[in-house]
Every structure is written in C-alpha cells, then in structure tokens.
C-alpha cells in the first residue's frame, strides 16, 4: 500500500515572537501546500515521530523510543489539546513487530504529547483527530540518547510493519533542525529543577506559564544577539537535508551525538525524528524527496525546514 512522508520543523514561539510578516506568510504557504498533499493522499493512518520537551516524558523513566497506544496532547503554548484517535490494537501490533526486529521500544497506554507532536498534526491535517494516528516518541533532549543509527533502524522496523498493514500511511517527522532553546539539563541542575525534570508531569498553570515566559524571553534575547544559546547553523542544516534527499540514509550512522550538539545545538538531536521517518519510507524501497522550504529563523530559535517524499516508483 502507498506511503507518503512529510517532515517539518516546529516552533512553540509562533505568535509569541515572530519574524517578518512575509516570512510567516511563506511558512504558512508551505504548510498549506503540505496540507493539500495530505488531503489528496487521504491517509488511513498517520504515524508521527516526535520529540518531547519535558512535558510528557521525564527522567523517572526516560525511554529512547516509545509507541503510544493511547495519547493526549497537553496543549502547551498555543498547541492543540485533547485526545488523539489512536488505534490501540494496531499500535500494540506495531510495538510487537518493532521489538521482534530487535529494536527495544517502550509502550505507553497513557502517553502525553506536547507541541512537538500536536503542531505537526495541526499543520498537516488541521486537527488532532482528522485521521487515526500513532505517536512514536523519540528522546531528543534528555541524555543519554540513542544514536542516529538506532533512530534509522527504528524507522526501518516501523516501515516494514506498515508496508504489511494494508493501509495508506502518512509518516511524519517533527523537529529540528539546528536549534538550542533554553531546555534545562539534569547535570548540574538545582534540586528544584532536577525534580521538575524527573517528575514534572501535570504542572500548575502558573508553573507552565512561567516556563513558557522564559522561552519567549530567551527568543527575544537570541534575536537581539544577547544570548549564550548555540547559534543556528544553516550550512549544517542544508548538509543534513541534502543527505536525506540523496537517499543515502545510512550515511547518518556516522553522525555522533557529540557532533550533533557541537554543530547544531543541544536540541538539534530532534533530527532523529526526520531520520526515523525517512527510515520508514526507505523500508518501502527507493524514494524521491523534495525540500520545500528552509530558512534560519532566529525569532523561532530554529533552522526551519519542510520536506516531503514518496516512493520513487509512484
């Protein structure tokens, strides 16, 4: 059965700290074109590879990968909130198949997803519940993290299952590219911050608002050039995007975690979601990919990109 891929960056800062109106309009135009492609494809299932930003996954138990058999979007920043229409039996079968392929993936029957997943669904489908969806969490901010090779192999295992599922499937990668927003780290954290990173589920509205305000303030400082955050790296971004487009996906295996942090920033590890999505597509055979948009957007603290792809035989 057919498969289609859409990969896109996300930002919680849209509407809080925005670039010039013409840049926002171009991003919205590109996302509208992606929605049109998805609408025409009319998927019977959407699989979203997405990170989390210490909103649903914490250091009490931090898996490298997790498949959601039931999931709720928490609605952080201005993202959509509510229950995702997850086909639980299919998600369970997916988890069993992935584990049979020697990829140790966790399973959640109460997954919480944040803007990293919800914004992608909103951008591509207009809602959380237009199509059945299986969220696949990939740890991208909380060391230790799996390698890009493992993310690729996760995607391959997911893709092999999907190719036998008898459904039109949209695979989505949400995250990246180069960026380093102010995500706290466990190493060297105060007792209060450490507790939030270990067991910070369901914070009070005041606590969530304070955290979001810190992110907005960091973006304003980043734009003003008064920030210690890692600079955006368009050259690195474009090299990564070109690698995906080339079809030589195994080349990502040589990208180490230390090199990703050094060149792209601490949150550039979200490229794992793109690698996994392309890994799923590649399980169907050779593909052709198009880069629809790329721009370094300081206001959103992100190298911002959109790609789509499909099997070469289509």
From Swiss-Prot:
Catalytic activity: 3-(2,3-dihydroxyphenyl)propanoate + O2 = (2Z,4E)-2-hydroxy-6-oxonona-2,4-dienedioate + H(+); (2E)-3-(2,3-dihydroxyphenyl)prop-2-enoate + O2 = (2Z,4E,7E)-2-hydroxy-6-oxonona-2,4,7-trienedioate + H(+)
Record: active site: 115, 179
Biological-process GO terms, alphabetical: 3-phenylpropionate catabolic process
Domain of life assignment: Bacteria
UniProtKB keywords: Aromatic hydrocarbons catabolism, Dioxygenase, Iron, Oxidoreductase
EC numbers on record: 1.13.11.16
Pfam families: LigB (PF02900)
CDD domains cross-referenced by the UniProt entry: MhpB_like
A molecular-function term among this protein's GO annotations: 3-carboxyethylcatechol 2,3-dioxygenase activity
Cofactor(s) needed: Fe(2+)
Pathway annotation from the record: Aromatic compound metabolism; 3-phenylpropanoate degradation
Subunit structure, as described in the record: Homotetramer.
Protein purpose: Catalyzes the non-heme iron(II)-dependent oxidative cleavage of 2,3-dihydroxyphenylpropionic acid and 2,3-dihydroxicinnamic acid into 2-hydroxy-6-ketononadienedioate and 2-hydroxy-6-ketononatrienedioate, respectively.
Family to which the UniProt record says this protein belongs: Belongs to the LigB/MhpB extradiol dioxygenase family.
Protein name: 2,3-dihydroxyphenylpropionate/2,3-dihydroxicinnamic acid 1,2-dioxygenase
Gene expressing this chain: mhpB
């Amino acid at each position: 059965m057919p498969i289609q891929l859409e990969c896109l960056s996300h930002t919680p800062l849209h509407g809080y700290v925005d670039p010039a109106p013409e840049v926002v309009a171009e991003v919205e135009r590109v996302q509208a074109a992606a929605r049109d492609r998805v609408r025409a494809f009319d998927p019977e299932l959407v699989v979203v590879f997405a990170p989390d930003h210490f909103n649903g996954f914490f250091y009490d138990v931090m898996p490298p990968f997790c498949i959601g058999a039931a999931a709720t979007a928490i609605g952080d920043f201005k993202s959509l909130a509510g229950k995702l229409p997850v086909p639980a039996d299919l998600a369970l079968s997916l988890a069993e198949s992935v584990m049979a392929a020697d990829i140790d993936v966790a399973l959640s029957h109460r997954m919480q997803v944040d803007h990293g997943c919800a914004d992608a669904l909103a951008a591509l489908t207009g809602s959380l519940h237009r199509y059945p969806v299986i969220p696949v969490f990939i740890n991208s901010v909380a060391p230790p993290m799996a390698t890009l090779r493992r993310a690729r192999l996760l995607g391959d295992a997911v893709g092999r299952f999907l190719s036998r599922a008898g459904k039109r499937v949209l695979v989505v990668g949400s995250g990246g590219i180069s960026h380093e927003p102010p995500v706290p780290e466990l190493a060297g954290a105060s007792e209060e911050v450490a507790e939030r990173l270990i067991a910070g589920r369901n914070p009070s509205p005041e606590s969530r608002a304070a955290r979001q305000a810190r992110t907005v303030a960091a973006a304003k400082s980043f734009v003003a050039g008064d920030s210690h955050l890692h600079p955006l790296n368009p050259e690195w971004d474009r090299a990564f995007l070109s690698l995906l487009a080339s079809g030589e996906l195994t080349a990502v295996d040589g990208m180490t975690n230390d090199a990703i942090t050094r060149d792209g920033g601490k949150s550039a590890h979200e490229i794992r979601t793109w690698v996994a999505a392309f890994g799923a597509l590649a399980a169907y055979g050779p593909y052709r990919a198009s880069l629809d948009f790329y721009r370094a957007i300081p206001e959103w603290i992100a190298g911002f990109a959109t790609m789509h792809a499909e099997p070469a035989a289509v």
